[in-house]
Amino acid sequence: MIEKYLLGTYTRRISKGVYQLELDTENQKLQNLTFVGSAIDPTYVAESNQKRIYAITKVKDDKGDVTGGFVEWDGTSDDFPLKPIASVHDQETSPAYIAVDEDKRLVFTANYHAGTVNTYRIADDGSISKADRIMDKGTLGFRKEQQDGPHPHYINLTPEGRVVAVDLGVDKVFIYDLEANGKLVPVSELQMQDGYGPRHIYFDAKKKVAYLVGELSSNVAVLDYDADKGVLSLRDIHSTIPDDWTEHNGAAAIRVSKDGRFVYVSNRGNNSIAVFSSDESGNLSLIQRISTEGDFPRDFNLSDDQSFVIALNQNSDNATLYTRDPESGKLTMIQKDFTVPEGVSILRKK
């Protein structure tokens, strides 16, 4: 079987925008890197059920001033590179994350450098209009990466349809109610310890927990989640790196197996994927730490049948493929030399 994945990238050295790769599950290999569309630093990509592709980007005017937003492409087409259906550039710089609400026809962005979360309405013809914009607030963390303001790093839906926003700068996780018109209504805030540096979060509705990656602290936290009230609370915290690791590291992406039994976190610096088992209550235990066979693994993803994991190494421009044991959750590297320029994110194409 051939599975296709969309790849977000930086375009600071050799990348030109968004790419696509194929996973050949029968022959157990990555293949056919294809250029999808041109954009400046399209680090994260989202796709709707209508197969519209939304990619973060930014533009520069004649004076060199930058505005950020995203571009929309028709993902049903294979006429690469794709031509934009629509685009919007109304933010101070390019966002850090993008997600889609299928039911309400909305797009969400988290803008790390501007300190804002934004919602947009998407019309039937693909046209885009702003629905809401909120500036994160809170006490800045003590680490140098937190000293210049709030830094929203992630926004998406919770399992019950609220919105969660994760802020690295103020060490907070925000929960919002979402109105039909795209307006965000504050519900609750979780204050993490100073310097935790929240980056990404994953909810397990069955276990009533969420797993929160701390980029700056190289941790993953288990949070209890009351979906009726929209309230998170801290249970415990686990390190993603070895105890004797003294060099720089930033925890990055988190993925959870479909059966909820295993949690995976990438480490940029230690250049590894940490593998945790998760019991019936969501408690974590470290069971493996495996090299990504490259430098700075920002993201990775599991295949449809959960038998493979694909990791992207940004600085070394390569993707690494692993087989995954569904019983133990452990990974085995089988390919490490597949070229992906400045890879940042990987999304299964619909």
Where are each of the predicted segments found?
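Asp-box/WD-like beta-propeller blade repeats and closely related beta-sheet repeat scaffolds
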Residues: 81-153
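A short beta-strand motif characteristic of beta-propeller blades
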Residues: 31-37, 83-88, 132, 139-145, ...
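Short loop/turn segments immediately following beta-strands, especially the blade-tip
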Residues: 21-28, 73-80, 120-129, 177-183, ...
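Short glycine/acidic-enriched loop and turn motifs that connect beta-strands
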Residues: 11-14, 59-64, 113-116, 170-172, ...
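Blade-loop segments of beta-propeller domains
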Residues: 32-104
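Loop-centered beta-sheet repeat module
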Residues: 162-218
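Beta-rich, blade/repeat-based domains predominating
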Residues: 39-50, 91-103, 138-160, 192-207, ...
